[in-house]
Amino acid sequence: MKFLKENKSTIEPIIYTSGIPAYTNMLIDLIDPKREIFEHRLYQNACYLFEKRDEDIFYMIKDITRFKNVRDMNRSILIDPNPLNFILSPENGLPFVGYNAELHTSGSDKDEYLIGMTDIIKEVGEQKDVRGYLKENYNIRQYLKNAKLM
């Protein structure tokens, strides 16, 4: 949170979740009750539904390109632990390891993975077009092709 507060003039963090508003707001309000950091929140209804009934597959996919009229895709990053969310905008994807409470059982354990990503986020943010940097360093499109997801 400290990093986001300190860089508010250059970073606009937006919560984009496949969760429902009631649940999401309850959690985010605990860490940002005045909406000083996360001014915008996008929920399930902002996701695309991918469904294959014959195979019992149901997934909500986040697509930041649907906001290209109000956000510059050259400057937009989707940070997500699930590679499926990069299918519709692979050049904007920055993967990370999701938090798993089951792995952090004692009170002293902290999830500091995102804190460790601050240098990466700063470096990406310094790029005129984040997509070239992300492609060169993460190449999500090739990963998705290799996994036969594209």
Predicted regions and their residues:
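Substrate-recognition element of Asp-dependent hydrolases with the DxDx(T/V) motif
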Residues: 2-29
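C-terminal cap/substrate-recognition subdomain and adjoining C-terminal extension
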Residues: 22-150
